[in-house]
Amino acid sequence: MRLLVAEAASPLSSAATPTCNSHTCRWKPYSNSTDFTANASVLLILVISALICALSLYAAIRCFLRPTLETEDDHKPDPEAAASSTPTTPTLVYSSDLELAGAEAECAICLSEFEQGESIQVLEKCQHGFHVKCIHKWLSTRSSCPTCRTSIFSQHSETPSSHINA
């Protein structure tokens, strides 16, 4: 009887301590710490690679879509060239008798009213008046009237009717 009990006990004891390998134990791949370290390393490498790719793409887009400083400087007018090419307009002394286009007695650039005896400049083409300092600063970056946006440069093209002799 002891033999029968020993045989019966032996399969139970071996079942209590099973040998677990990757084919017989389904939890084996998740229990090995070296596999977890390798998986974490691969995941970390993938995240870093994705970050590098994203930053490279951002830099490329910023480089190609953003104009360079050299092209921006080409579009800005040169103040010295603008001063030399700006037509000279006479400086007048403001008085209430002075008639300006639009009948406004204020500078459209600084929005302050003209005072008696103040120096102003009147543009020849549109007859709008401005403070001397205001219009010089305006014309150093632009070539149009601040009020009506008319070009300050005169057009030299004459109409054909001006050549007809009667």
UniProtKB/Swiss-Prot annotation:
Pathway: Protein modification; protein ubiquitination. GO terms for molecular function: transferase activity; zinc ion binding. Keywords: Membrane, Metal-binding, Signal, Transferase, Transmembrane, Transmembrane helix, Ubl conjugation pathway, Zinc, Zinc-finger. Pfam families: zf-RING_2. Residues 81-90 have a biased composition (Low complexity). InterPro entries: ATL10/ATL72-79-like (IPR044602), Znf_RING (IPR001841), Znf_RING/FYVE/PHD (IPR013083). It catalyses: S-ubiquitinyl-[E2 ubiquitin-conjugating enzyme]-L-cysteine + [acceptor protein]-L-lysine = [E2 ubiquitin-conjugating enzyme]-L-cysteine + N(6)-ubiquitinyl-[acceptor protein]-L-lysine. Its EC number is 2.3.2.27. It is an enzyme of class 2 (transferase). It comes from the Eukaryota. GO terms for biological process: protein ubiquitination. CDD domains: RING-H2_EL5-like. It is found in: Membrane. The chain crosses the membrane at residues 41-61. Residues 1-16 form the signal peptide. It is a single-pass membrane protein. SUPFAM superfamilies: RING/U-box. A zinc finger (RING-type) spans 107-149. PROSITE patterns: ZF_RING_2 (PS50089). Residues 71-90 are annotated as: Disordered. One of its GO terms (cellular component) is membrane. PANTHER family: RING-H2 FINGER PROTEIN ATL78 (PTHR46905), RING-TYPE E3 UBIQUITIN TRANSFERASE (PTHR46905:SF1). The RING-type zinc finger domain mediates binding to an E2 ubiquitin-conjugating enzyme. Belongs to the RING-type zinc finger family. ATL subfamily. This is RING-H2 finger protein ATL79. It comes from Arabidopsis thaliana. The gene is ATL79.
